[in-house]
Amino acid sequence: MPKLKTRKAAAKRFRATGTGKIVRRKAGKSHLLEHKSSDKKRSMSKTTLVHERDELNVRLMLPYL
């Protein structure tokens, strides 16, 4: 059976934790930051878990994750 290809765009955006959960970065921290509060910018810097409904799609894009 041939090797499965990895979606490179997804590989740059997601990673797996030690327990096998998938984490992502939060959106909205690239520009237009002047009017956002420090608390909001700080919370957007943290990573968060991928929702369980989306996790299957991410795992299909990343077969060797």
UniProtKB/Swiss-Prot annotation:
GO molecular function: structural constituent of ribosome
Entry-linked Gene3D superfamilies: 4.10.410.60
Basic and acidic residues bias: start-end ranges: 31-42
Region of interest (Disordered), ranges: 24-48
Keyword Aminoacyl-tRNA synthetase: no
GO cellular component: a single term: cytosolic large ribosomal subunit
The keyword Lipid biosynthesis belongs to this UniProt entry's keyword annotation: no
Pfam families per UniProt: Ribosomal_L35p
UniProtKB keywords: Ribonucleoprotein, Ribosomal protein
Alphabetical GO biological process terms: translation
InterPro entries listed in its UniProt record: Ribosomal_bL35, Ribosomal_bL35-like, Ribosomal_bL35_CS, Ribosomal_bL35_sf
Family: Belongs to the bacterial ribosomal protein bL35 family.
The protein's name in its UniProt record: Large ribosomal subunit protein bL35
Lineage of source species: Bacteria, Bacillati, Cyanobacteriota, Cyanophyceae, Nostocales
Gene: rpmI
